């Protein structure tokens, strides 16, 4: 919904929140359901109302537990029967500088301020440890906005007795805690309040009248930032940028002005703007976001523009380049198909409002931000939080290279008339083995991102995955696939629970990067072999349909399983006898971890 995309009208959202919610709930979208506990050190009702709108727009339907006013610490540390029975999927702790127990006094010594700092950190760490111990779910914790006043002026920043200094120390300690604890995230209200304007954010009347830790008009900005973290935790990030060229990556029209006539580089102020935007996009690419081009241009001109010596993005930085005179919505469909990702994983950037309108109308799940002034391009993309990072792995760093290698594989496939011969030619080698601690973060990340080849779409938090890893009643497999063109990284995960003489498959997923390579057969062979080694007789598989996983509806049937039941919603149960099972993998050499 456009009204909920950055930049939004906060006043309109606050006024129309009920009608917007009705529209979202009646739009026919399929959403994942999540339970979110909000433990507040100040009033949280309007925050929850606004957060709900942004999450619904992201494809998440939340239900909320809301603590009583300023009971956040007690609920977490001493327990709460209602919160326990709610069994949250995620906990958000909403505190602000109003919840700092005590600030240093101007008469305190360095030793006294250090002791006060340690006391404050112990207060929060005790709460976080109790939450982890009791609820085993992701936690989002606000850091602190800057104080409303500086008693010592600029000295507040470096004097140990200054409030600014004390808050900065706490924020650094909060960040260090998040860096060393999985599934713990910081909602950076220090940054959000600075962007909004600290004087407006900290308007005292909202606290004294209503116990709001921020002014009410700032709540949509706060909720939007928080929602970005939550949607990332639950696998709703975008994956790729689709970029126009003329007046988007450079100033001017390369086909009319020539390469020498476009604006990019240090010679003009607008050239500097476009050069800075290209550098920003390069940084985004380095985080694992895929870059593609969709431009109405002759390909020769497009490539010439991308090879401009003052530009930092070159043709090799893009996985796909669609430079032709076809309608852009058709090209974007082809890009999604070529990358093997959903259209809802794409963000389209174009300076032309007519092109944006056409793509929005024809491809409503593609994100199309308003790109009005080149000077604002970075801010619009960055503040839209399309690519919020809550987990980061070495595979993310290599994603663009992996997809480019896929393009080379596709080119080689075209040379073969026999698909089996093509698979043989790839010289594929897979490592399939039990989980390793070093891979748990990547495995958890995959469970929250893979949607197409995912039979149950069960999601796991890091804590839940660690429980599975420690439980001998599970058979766990990760699969890593490499071939002569490169290493695809960890691409498949299977988790099966032993029940008597049966293995129930709780989770089976595979990255779309390796579809149609027969990796699923290699995983199945390994799974059945391990099940037989444990004396099991039957493997039972489950398929739960979603809007995105229809491609695996008959996977178990293709494997030779027998369908034993199907309900009115299309949920199916399948069984395979291990007696006489014959291996199915023909093309992949399988190794165990060395």
Annotate the PLM regions.
Residues 332-353, 359:
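Conserved Lys-Pro-Asp/Glu-containing loop-to-beta segment of HAD-superfamily phosphomonoesterases
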Residues 254-279, 364-372:
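Basic, amphipathic juxtamembrane/active-site segments
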Residues 431-511:
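A conserved beta-strand-loop-helix scaffold within acyl/acetyltransferase catalytic domains
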Residues 297-323:
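Substrate-recognition/cap helix-loop segment adjacent to the acidic, metal-dependent catalytic center
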Residues 484, 490-567:
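Acyl-donor binding region in acyl/amide transferases
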Residues 276-307, 359, 455-460, 464-465, ...:
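Substrate-recognition element of Asp-dependent hydrolases with the DxDx(T/V) motif
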Residues 338, 360, 364-426, 529-594:
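Terminal substrate-recognition subdomain of acyl/acetyltransferases
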